[in-house]
């Protein structure tokens, strides 16, 4: 018989640096999950990812206090910041432009994120990434 699911916890954890401190500790502690067990397993699974890369993580907690987790690809904004060299996006979205990104770069990001995006094809995925870029204050240029 399958284990009964108690709930899901969604966190954004930096690769290779999961620690019992907030936000991980309190989120897992509320559900009675072994915090150190999660931290060790997460760090082991993400050792091949560049340290400090934010990874959206969905933790499934079962009634017997055991857990499983799935890490997804880094957020689109992480890739956009990496390409443009920005620390953060525009303060006034829509009125301020902080950098430029090409359609080719958007397509490359869409290819990386395709499995996590709610899109049927690469063009739709690229449009989703384009929306994130515009929200950050990036200008889309043809290349």
Swiss-Prot record:
InterPro entries: Ribosomal_uL11, Ribosomal_uL11_bac-typ, Ribosomal_uL11_C, Ribosomal_uL11_C_sf, Ribosomal_uL11_N, Ribosomal_uL11_N_sf. It comes from the Bacteria. One or more lysine residues are methylated. GO terms for biological process: translation. GO terms for cellular component: cytosolic large ribosomal subunit. Keywords: Methylation, Ribonucleoprotein, Ribosomal protein, RNA-binding, rRNA-binding. Part of the ribosomal stalk of the 50S ribosomal subunit. Interacts with L10 and the large rRNA to form the base of the stalk. L10 forms an elongated spine to which L12 dimers bind in a sequential fashion forming a multimeric L10(L12)X complex. Forms part of the ribosomal stalk which helps the ribosome interact with GTP-bound translation factors. Belongs to the universal ribosomal protein uL11 family. This is Large ribosomal subunit protein uL11.
């Amino acid at each position: 018989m399958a284990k009964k699911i108690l709930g899901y916890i969604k966190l954004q954890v930096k690769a290779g640096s999961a620690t019992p401190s907030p936000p991980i500790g309190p989120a897992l502690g509320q559900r009675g999950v072994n915090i150190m067990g999660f931290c060790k397993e997460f760090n082991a699974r993400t050792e091949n990812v560049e340290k400090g890369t934010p990874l959206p993580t969905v933790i499934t907690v079962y009634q017997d206090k055991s857990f499983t987790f799935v890490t997804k690809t880094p957020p689109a904004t992480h890739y956009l910041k990496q390409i443009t060299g920005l620390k953060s996006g525009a303060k006034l979205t829509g009125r301020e432009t902080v950098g430029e990104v090409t359609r080719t770069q958007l397509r490359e990001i869409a290819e990386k994120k395709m499995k996590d995006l709610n899109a049927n094809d690469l063009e739709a995925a690229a449009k989703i990434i384009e929306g994130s870029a515009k929200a950050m204050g990036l200008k889309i240029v043809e290349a």
